[in-house]
């Protein structure tokens, strides 16, 4: 395959059909609620309108689940705040070096708590995993109560960290369709997955499961450089 690769360069004069310009400083952390990646709100909007938005999600879920199981999210509200049961950063979508380093910076010095909330991180590759060990990110995550697992995309398709029945999981992964996380509707099971960015998931973990946008925490990101070690694959 390496012999089949070649460099791609633009010509001296290049024409484009158009350009999409995005001012990233104006983008707020988002959450895609169950049960579709397009069911999107800003985290601030959700936290400000919890009862109304969760009720709307529940009504849509009745259609998605075809009434096969009972479904509720409003029971996740405690003292006016939304508490989730699980946080996961995983695989090709979330498990990149920069994401996990930023998550480690956010959660460093905090503790995820000893209640129901759990936090798992799956690096996208073994070389990434090794570099995270070398630079101390894994130690910072583990000290806070994070479970750092092998390079595996399992949570994305229900092969790892399947939530408990009626649990609510926030994930930096790719999809949140009904039962994709591993629950079996034919056995009366249902769980909810909402898609978020890794930094906001880490901020939520630092707050022991209270849904938190990364913009609501004050942190200095270390931004370490990634060094690829090919020996893992060469050996």
Predicted regions located by residue number:
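Single conserved hydrophobic/aromatic residue that forms the stacking wall/gate
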Residues: 1-9
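Solvent-exposed alpha-helices and their adjacent loops that cap or buttress functional pockets
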Residues: 12-16, 79-82, 111-114, 140, ...
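Non-catalytic terminal/interface segments that mediate subunit docking, oligomerization
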Residues: 20-119, 123-126, 235
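Short acidic, glycine/serine/threonine-rich loops at helix termini
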Residues: 32-36, 98-102, 130-135, 159-163, ...
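Extended C-terminal subregions enriched in glycine
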Residues: 94-95, 112-163, 168
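Conserved phosphate/anionic-ligand binding catalytic regions in large, soluble enzymes, centered on
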Residues: 87-99, 154-163, 174-178, 189-206
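A glycine-rich phosphate-binding loop feature that marks nucleotide/adenosyl-phosphate handling sites
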Residues: 3, 13-14, 21-27, 122-125, ...
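Extended hydrophobic packing segments that form well-structured cores
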Residues: 181-235
């Amino acid at each position: 395959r390496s012999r089949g690769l070649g460099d791609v360069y633009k010509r001296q004069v290049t024409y484009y059909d158009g350009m999409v310009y995005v001012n990233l400083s104006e983008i707020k952390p988002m959450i895609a609620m169950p049960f579709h990646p397009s069911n999107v709100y800003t985290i601030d909007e959700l936290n400000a309108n919890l009862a109304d938005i969760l009720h709307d999600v529940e009504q849509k879920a009745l259609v998605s689940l075809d009434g096969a199981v009972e479904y509720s999210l409003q029971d996740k509200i405690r003292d006016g705040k939304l508490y989730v049961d699980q946080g996961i950063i995983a695989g090709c979508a979330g498990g990149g070096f920069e994401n996990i380093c930023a998550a480690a910076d956010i959660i460093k010095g905090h503790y995820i708590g000893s209640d129901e909330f759990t936090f798992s991180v799956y690096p996208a590759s073994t070389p990434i995993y090794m570099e995270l060990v070398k630079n101390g990110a894994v130690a910072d995550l583990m000290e806070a109560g994070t479970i750092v697992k092998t390079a595996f995309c399992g949570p994305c398709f229900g092969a790892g960290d399947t939530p408990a029945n009626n649990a609510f999981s926030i994930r930096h992964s790719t999809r949140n369709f009904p039962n994709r996380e591993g629950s079996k509707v034919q056995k009366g099971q249902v769980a909810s997955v909402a898609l978020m960015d890794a930094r906001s998931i880490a901020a939520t973990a630092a707050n022991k499961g209270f849904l938190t946008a990364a913009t609501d925490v004050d942190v200095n990101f270390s931004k370490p450089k990634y060094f690829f070690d090919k020996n893992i694959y060469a050996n």
